[in-house]
Amino acid sequence: MAGSYGVMADDGSIDYTVHEAWNEATNVYLIVILVSFGLFMYAKRNKRKIMRIFSVPPTEGMLSEPSFYDTVSRIRLRQQVEAHPVSRKYEYQQPQSQADSVQLSLE
């Protein structure tokens, strides 16, 4: 039976080369699966670190543009600065008199 691909060799003993190859292949697959699972768990725990690696740093044009919250706070500050003299002007124009107060009398 020369050249046969059976499990039995010519002398009647079992040929283990197929089994050894299968065992080696399954060991490799098992290692690949375990390493993949470990990498998945690491990525799940350290998502922010990994995303920081792949994020593009801001360009020069982005640095000159202020953020939305900075713009809003500056607008609000400017509005307060503009409104302050107006309120002071109104306070100085109104004489401090008793006409603004209400007096109650009991009868």
From Swiss-Prot:
Q: Which GO terms describe its cellular component?
A: membrane
- Regions of biased composition (Polar residues) lie at 93-107
Indicate the secretion signal residues.
none
In terms of Pfam families, this protein maps to:
UPF0697
Q: Membrane-spanning regions, if any?
A: 25-43
Q: Does the keyword Transport apply?
A: no
Question: Where's it mainly located?
Answer: membrane
Region annotation (Disordered) ranges: 88-107
**What is the top-level taxon of the source organism?**
Eukaryota
Keywords linked to the UniProt accession: Membrane, Transmembrane, Transmembrane helix
Q: Where in the cell is it found?
A: Membrane
Q: How does it sit in the membrane?
A: Single-pass membrane protein
Q: Which InterPro entries match?
A: SMIM19
Would the keyword Hydrolase be found if you checked this record's keyword annotation?
A: no
Entry similarity comment = Belongs to the SMIM19 family.
Q: What is this protein called?
A: Small integral membrane protein 19
Q: Which gene encodes it?
A: Smim19
